[in-house]
Amino acid sequence: MSMQDPIADMLTRIRNGQAANKVAVTMPSAKLKVAIANVLKEEGFIEDFKVEGDTKPELELTLKYFQGKAVVESIQRVSRPGLRIYKKKDELPKVMAGLGIAVVSTSKGVMTDRAARQAGLGGEIICYVA
C-alpha cells in the first residue's frame, strides 16, 4: 500500500517525535521533504537533518528542544493532495502574527512566507509551523 500524503506523514512524525521527547525521527527521503527540512533548520525549528542510504534513502531529522520543551508548538498541513491551496504574494498568510512561518513552494523553490513576500512570489502553502 502506497502512502497517500508523504508530507503529512513527515509533519506527523515530527509532531509525534517531539511529543515523545525523541532525539531524532527518520522517514523515507524525497526532494520536497529535504527542502522542507532545510527551511525548518534555517528557521531554527530543528537542529539538523541528514540523508542516508543509496537504494532507499532515509531522511533523519534531529529535533530541537529549549529548556526541555519542544521548539515546534504546532505544525499543521495546509495544502493537501485533495485540496491544493495556492496564494498570490499579497495573500500569503502571517502565522501567529509573524511568530510562526508558512512553508511555501514557489517557482524558485521551497521557502518561508517572509522570503516569498520579499522575492515577490506566490505559491502553494505547504504547512504552518509555530
Swiss-Prot record:
<keyword id="KW-0687">Ribonucleoprotein</keyword>
<comment type="subunit">
    <text>Part of the 30S ribosomal subunit. Contacts proteins S5 and S12.</text>
</comment>
<dbReference type="GO" id="GO:0003735">
    <property type="term" value="F:structural constituent of ribosome"/>
</dbReference>
<keyword id="KW-0689">Ribosomal protein</keyword>
<dbReference type="InterPro" id="IPR000630">
    <property type="entry name" value="Ribosomal_uS8"/>
</dbReference>
<keyword id="KW-0694">RNA-binding</keyword>
<keyword id="KW-0699">rRNA-binding</keyword>
<dbReference type="GO" id="GO:1990904">
    <property type="term" value="C:ribonucleoprotein complex"/>
</dbReference>
<dbReference type="GO" id="GO:0005840">
    <property type="term" value="C:ribosome"/>
</dbReference>
<dbReference type="InterPro" id="IPR047863">
    <property type="entry name" value="Ribosomal_uS8_CS"/>
</dbReference>
<comment type="similarity">
    <text>Belongs to the universal ribosomal protein uS8 family.</text>
</comment>
<dbReference type="GO" id="GO:0006412">
    <property type="term" value="P:translation"/>
</dbReference>
<dbReference type="InterPro" id="IPR035987">
    <property type="entry name" value="Ribosomal_uS8_sf"/>
</dbReference>
<dbReference type="Pfam" id="PF00410">
    <property type="entry name" value="Ribosomal_S8"/>
</dbReference>
<protein>
    <recommendedName>
        <fullName>Small ribosomal subunit protein uS8</fullName>
    </recommendedName>
</protein>
<dbReference type="GO" id="GO:0019843">
    <property type="term" value="F:rRNA binding"/>
</dbReference>
<comment type="function">
    <text>One of the primary rRNA binding proteins, it binds directly to 16S rRNA central domain where it helps coordinate assembly of the platform of the 30S subunit.</text>
</comment>
